[in-house]
From Swiss-Prot:
The keyword Nucleotide-binding applies. The gene is norQ. This is Protein NorQ. It comes from Paracoccus denitrificans (strain Pd 1222). InterPro entries: ATPase_dyneun-rel_AAA (IPR011704), CbbQ/NirQ/NorQ/GpvN (IPR050764), CbbQ_C (IPR013615), P-loop_NTPase (IPR027417). Belongs to the CbbQ/NirQ/NorQ/GpvN family. It comes from the Bacteria. ATP binds at residues 42-49, 102-109. Pfam families: AAA_5 (PF07728), CbbQ_C (PF08406). Keywords: ATP-binding, Nucleotide-binding. GO terms for molecular function: ATP binding; ATP hydrolysis activity.
Length: 270
């Protein structure tokens, strides 16, 4: 099966740390209470996946996370017949398991999946809340608690990879972005354990780098990468080397652009 799936148990005690940026928690809770699907839009590494994990734990629901990719098909989500012990046995995919169990199914970067995936989602994202399985003849009604959540990065969309309006309009949608600096400092310090003074410098650098998006860089540095740089620094790595490894090399292969980013870091840290 080509789906890359992560599962998460329930229980608010295990909720991953997430610092709200606005009213996204309230919107998600209201959508969940009304059995509405949710679409999260925002750049890579801004906290969408962490938010979903936090909300699943907060609501006490199991979570199936599927990392979508070019080869992900509807069969990967629904299931297929597999050979086991000399016989052919039907095996549910992550979407089917979530529908049966009343769990949250999160499709990360849904636009990366094959087009047949969106067709499967349509009957789950209207008042029918059903999942037809042609291979078995079943038509599964979603168990109480089932919720479909999908995400994508609008900045990566092109004419071949986009969500049709007919699909987008089936979801409650929320836009995410990188946290404002004071909140990002709090997040990075909490996640990495680095002192706030050095964390503040890394966040300032991240803001400067994000200003280059669309010019020298396809994408700005993510909060995730800032956490990586802070974590490396806290473990004793030289700050310049940590920035190079976590905030420069992952963004570009262009030697000239990398030199410019190093100069930017030097201007901030001296």
């Amino acid at each position: 099966m080509n789906a890359h799936v992560k599962t998460q148990g329930n229980g608010a005690v295990d909720a991953p740390f997430y610092l709200p940026q606005g009213d996204e928690v309230a919107v998600f809770e209201a959508a969940a209470a009304n059995d509405l699907p949710v679409l999260l839009k925002g750049p890579t590494g801004c906290g969408k996946t962490r938010f979903v994990a936090h909300m699943a734990a907060r609501l006490g629901r199991p979570l199936y996370t599927v990392a979508c990719h070019d080869d992900l098909s509807a069969a990967d989500l629904i299931g297929r017949y597999l050979l086991k012990g000399g016989e052919t046995v039907w095996t549910d995919g992550p979407l089917t398991r979530a529908v049966r169990e009343g769990a949250i199914c999160y499709l990360d970067e849904v636009v990366e999946a094959r087009k047949d995936v969106t067709v499967v989602l349509h009957p789950l994202t209207d008042d029918r809340r059903i999942l037809p399985i042609d291979r078995t003849g079943e038509e599964i009604e979603a168990a109480p608690g089932f919720m479909l959540v999908a995400s994508y990065n609008p900045g990566y969309q092109n004419i071949l990879k986009t969500l049709k309006p007919s699909t987008r309009q089936r979801f409650v949608a929320m836009e995410f972005d990188f946290p404002e600096p004071a909140r990002e400092v709090e997040i990075v310090a909490r996640e990495s354990g680095l002192d706030r003074d050095r964390t503040l410098g890394l966040v300032r650098l991240a803001g400067k780098i994000r200003g280059l998006k669309g010019q020298d860089l396809e994408e700005g540095v993510s909060t995730r990468l800032v956490v990586y740089a802070a974590s490396l620094t806290r473990r004793g790595m030289n700050l310049d080397r940590a920035i190079e490894a976590a905030m420069i090399e992952p963004l570009t292969d262009d030697a000239e652009v990398k030199r410019g980013l190093r100069d930017l870091a030097a201007a901030i840290f001296g």
